[in-house]
């Protein structure tokens, strides 16, 4: 089976769904953000603070290309889709899943989360503007799942059905 790339805005449920899907499909799951932190030996928020977002995006592009293209679930950072080369790579080498969640719901979830470098100012308008600027890229995915106010079980049932279509 081709790799499954799980995309979506921060807080949409990519990591959670990736872990559950890996158990259901008996496939390994790899989180690009976690792999970048391991390779760079620092937290993403520190990469952003010390090297900037552009450096992080470069690490992200390198990471996605270094991962297997068969039999693995890859959970991505929310901004990986900003680069056309990443979108092209994922489409050519796997099935791309877009987990959508209403940005107002995500903002409420993330209000107290200090690990999100792009949500530190807690500026809801800027957060939603960033989401909207990426939305068309997310929507290039093969499979779209709306996770807003759904349980993990509901999301999984819908996702498994769409993967098997």
Curated annotation (Swiss-Prot):
Its cofactor is Mg(2+). It is found in: Cytoplasm. SUPFAM superfamilies: P-loop containing nucleoside triphosphate hydrolases (SSF52540). Coiled coil: none annotated. ATP binds at residues 11-16, 116. Gene3D superfamilies: P-loop containing nucleotide triphosphate hydrolases (3.40.50.300). Binds 1 Mg(2+) ion per subunit. Its EC number is 2.7.1.71. It catalyses: shikimate + ATP = 3-phosphoshikimate + ADP + H(+). It is an enzyme of class 2 (transferase). GO terms for biological process: amino acid biosynthetic process; aromatic amino acid family biosynthetic process; chorismate biosynthetic process. Substrate binds at residues 33, 57, 78, 134. Signal peptide: none annotated. Keywords: Amino-acid biosynthesis, Aromatic amino acid biosynthesis, ATP-binding, Cytoplasm, Kinase, Magnesium, Metal-binding, Nucleotide-binding, Transferase. Its main location: cytoplasm. GO terms for molecular function: ATP binding; magnesium ion binding; shikimate kinase activity. Pathway: Metabolic intermediate biosynthesis; chorismate biosynthesis; chorismate from D-erythrose 4-phosphate and phosphoenolpyruvate: step 5/7. GO terms for cellular component: cytosol. Transmembrane segments: none annotated. InterPro entries: P-loop_NTPase, Shikimate/glucono_kinase, Shikimate_kinase/TSH1. Mg(2+) binds at residue 15. Belongs to the shikimate kinase family. Catalyzes the specific phosphorylation of the 3-hydroxyl group of shikimic acid using ATP as a cosubstrate. HAMAP family: Shikimate_kinase (MF_00109). Monomer. This is Shikimate kinase. The lineage of its organism: Bacteria, Bacillati, Bacillota, Bacilli, Bacillales.
């Amino acid at each position: 089976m081709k790799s499954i790339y799980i995309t979506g805005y921060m807080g949409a449920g990519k990591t959670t769904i990736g872990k559950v899907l890996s158990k259901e499909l008996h496939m390994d799951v790899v989180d690009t953000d976690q792999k970048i932190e391991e390779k760079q030996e620092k937290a993403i928020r520190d990469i952003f603070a010390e090297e900037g977002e552009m450096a992080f995006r470069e690490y992200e592009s390198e990471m996605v290309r270094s991962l297997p293209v068969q039999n693995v679930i890859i959970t991505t950072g929310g901004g990986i889709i900003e680069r056309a080369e990443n979108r092209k790579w994922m489409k050519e080498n796997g099935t791309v899943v877009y987990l959508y969640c209403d940005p107002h719901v995500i903002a409420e979830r993330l209000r107290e989360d200090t690990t999100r470098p792009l949500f530190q100012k807690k500026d809801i308008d800027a957060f939603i503007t960033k989401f909207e600027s990426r939305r068309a890229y997310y929507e290039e995915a093969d499979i779209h799942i709306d996770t807003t106010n759904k349980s993990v079980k509901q999301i999984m049932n819908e996702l498994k059905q769409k993967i098997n279509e």
